[in-house]
Regions:
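Bacterial N-terminal signal peptides that target proteins for export
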Residues: 2-14
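Beta-strand-rich ligand-recognition modules
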Residues: 29-70, 74-80, 91-187, 197, ...
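Extended extracellular/luminal ectodomain segments enriched in beta-structured repeat modules
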Residues: 78-87, 215-223, 234
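Short, contiguous, pocket-lining structural segments
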Residues: 205, 216, 254
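Bacterial N-terminal signal peptides
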Residues: 12-24
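A short secondary-structure junction signal
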Residues: 203, 207-209, 232-240
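Compositionally biased low-complexity segments at domain edges in trafficked proteins
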Residues: 182-206, 213, 346-414
Length: 589
């Protein structure tokens, strides 16, 4: 017998599958072959049936300095307050010329709505691009009027001439019989100190993004969306080595382990892996024209399950929630948003923490090496960095459903190998890095396992970089990069799979830069770039798009390969981009 109020698929999922047909393609059908403009394989956010209400945040703004770009927000009229879906759309462009990649952020009431970086222009190409983010889980924030800002610092002068332009809007899809209102968090709370919003600078491992909050007293689930972006000396953290090796291999120090650590009242509460984003000016700008690296234009937050702490957080006392970046070495920018589901039938949820094996496991990697330096000063060998932690965090909450026991069981691992070949004429460094998360969140009522959420996440990175002299007194720098993102999720009830999905996003890029004897760039050759994005789920949804380019021009684009009828099709309520969802939302609690 099931606990009172539960069904096998939950009223939300049952209603959706009973009422909806499969949505259409996620990208436009027009071919990009021959284009030099930004071209990506990523899916856009699938939409429910119906006409959305549109709220413009800003339109046609020019970003030429570091001044504020504030905007006022009010919920749309005529769409109700319980929406089927909310989508952020933003469009950016940069005038042709010279300009660095820049960080772009959109905020509302202290909460981050979008985070990414810009495409670098060239002397002949004025790139433009479109980004989207599913903000349905932030509906509680969007039901209230507020103030926001676009943060996009830029420098325009006689040298750096590229002017960045941007517009952004929110699309609200009203709930209907065919598109029921989404089950969303009841509270959406930022951790930053800026009431309008801005990222927090974390200079070292001890620098916190933190906030002390007195929270609602009826929390039954809690999550934290985390973004940690490398900047300045940390931009190329994935190529750095421990300080003791830096001089020998002529690389940045500080090591290459980075990981976001979440704590509650100083107690470890979870881990958010850091993605090795490479910006469009990174390593060799030609690598990323016209296709940037994985998520470069649109970062994806990682969602940390804090539900075992729900009972503790509901006790009416102030609690400090914090994020630190282990290994930060001047510096990271961080954003974090707390998402709380509240019991609609109780004013007070009581409970506590039962077990936390993450406490006492410091994020300290093991370092090894096979480096050898001969009598001529030639260096060869590798430096390895490894850390793997398995932990279990368990807690309980007395809710209107009864006592709910929640457990997060997770293994987070990091491996990095930096291989070097250095002699009088050659410098070669090969980076092989893999960050992985294998976890399961379980929720029980008595003997009944009412929700189970599995995640298998991988961030592979390979960078092969070499610098060699040429016969004419110049130099060549050859680079090959592979970036990947894969995520497999599965939701179960009573041992049966309710939903499963697989997301894969890979980018492979290569180029060779030519330098004269004074290290001025004189040209490049051999530029190639390819991206493949794939999604499949247990409902029959399928998305696959591949793009390839040579010398900055799109040479091939294919959609729907391997999908039924050769077409991309997904249900509107799924997340083909791999963006986070709350693990047990499909069960209706």
């Amino acid at each position: 017998m099931l606990p009172r109020g539960y069904s096998k698929c939950g009223p939300w999922l049952c209603g959706l599958l009973g009422a909806l047909s499969i949505a259409g393609p996620c990208v436009a059908d027009a071919s990009a072959v021959g284009s030099t403009n930004v071209t990506v394989a990523d899916p856009t956010v699938p939409r429910p049936p119906g006409t959305p209400c549109v709220v413009t945040l800003f339109s046609g703004d020019s970003f030429v300095d570091f001044s504020d770009h504030p905007y006022s927000y009010a919920p749309p009229g005529g769409c109700g307050t319980h929406w089927a879906k909310v989508v952020l759309e933003a469009d950016f462009s940069v005038t042709a010329g010279r300009q660095f990649d820049r960080t772009a952020q959109l905020w509302l009431g202290g909460v981050n709505l979008y985070y990414g970086t810009t495409q670098e222009p060239s002397s002949t190409v004025s790139p433009s691009w479109h980004v989207e983010r599913d903000l349905t889980d932030y509906s509680a924030l969007l039901r209230q009027a507020g103030t926001g800002r676009a943060v996009l610092g830029n420098v325009v002068n006689g040298t750096y001439t590229g002017v960045i332009h941007g517009s952004a809007r929110l699309l609200f899809y009203p709930a209907s019989l065919r598109a029921p209102g989404a089950l969303t968090p009841d509270s959406v709370l930022p951790l930053g100190s800026d009431a309008v919003g801005n990222a927090t600078l974390l200079d070292t491992s001890d620098s916190p993004l933190s906030k002390t909050l007195t929270l609602p007293t009826n929390i039954d689930r809690a999550y934290l969306d985390v973004i940690a972006q490398s900047q300045s000396s940390d931009e190329f953290w994935y190529t750095c080595v421990p300080d003791s090796y830096a001089a020998e291999v002529q690389e940045c120090g500080g090591g290459n382990f980075r990981e976001a650590e979440v704590s509650i009242d100083g107690q470890p509460a979870g881990v958010a892996p850091v993605y090795p984003w490479i910006y469009t000016g990174g390593i060799d700008p030609y690598l990323w024209r016209p296709t940037p690296g994985v998520q470069t234009l649109n970062f994806m937050p990682y969602r940390v399950d804090l539900t075992p702490f729900a009972g503790l957080l509901s006790d009416g006392n102030p609690h400090t929630v914090a994020v630190n970046v282990a290994g930060a070495n001047h510096y990271f920018l961080a954003s974090a948003t707390l998402l709380l589901y509240q019991d609609p039938h109780l004013r007070r949820v009581r409970g506590g923490l039962l077990r936390n094996t993450l406490a006492g496991q410091a994020p300290t990697p093991t370092i090894g090496d096979t480096l050898a330096t001969d009598t001529d000063g030639n260096v060869s060998g590798a430096i390895t960095t490894r850390l793997s932690r398995h932990y279990v965090i368990a807690g309980y909450a007395i809710t209107s459903h009864g006592r709910v026991d929640s457990t997060v069981d997770q293994t987070v691992a990091f491996t990095d190998t930096q291989s070097f070949t250095i002699d009088a004429s050659t410098y070669r460094q090969v980076t092989d890095q893999l960050t992985s998360v294998d976890g399961v969140s379980r929720h029980r009522i008595g003997r009944h396992l009412v929700a189970e959420y599995h995640e298998r996440l991988r961030y592979p990175l390979h960078v092969d970089y070499s610098f060699d002299p040429t016969s004419d007194g110049g130099y060549v720098m050859a680079t090959q990069v592979h970036q990947g993102y894969t995520n497999d999720i599965r939701r179960e009830f009573a041992g049966r799979t309710l939903y499963a999905a697989h997301v894969s996003n890979t980018v492979d890029a290569g180029d060779t830069l030519d330098f004269d004897g004074s290290f001025n760039v004189t040209g490049h050759n051999g530029q190639q770039n390819a991206q493949s994005f794939a999604f499949r789920d247990s409902l029959g949804g399928c998305y696959r798009t591949d793009v390839a380019s040579t010398d900055g021009v799109v040479t091939d684009e294919a959609t729907g390969v391997g999908c039924p009828d050769g077409q991309n099709h997904v249900y509107w309520f799924t997340r083909p981009d791999g963006s986070p969802v709350s693990g047990s939302a499909l069960l209706g609690w």
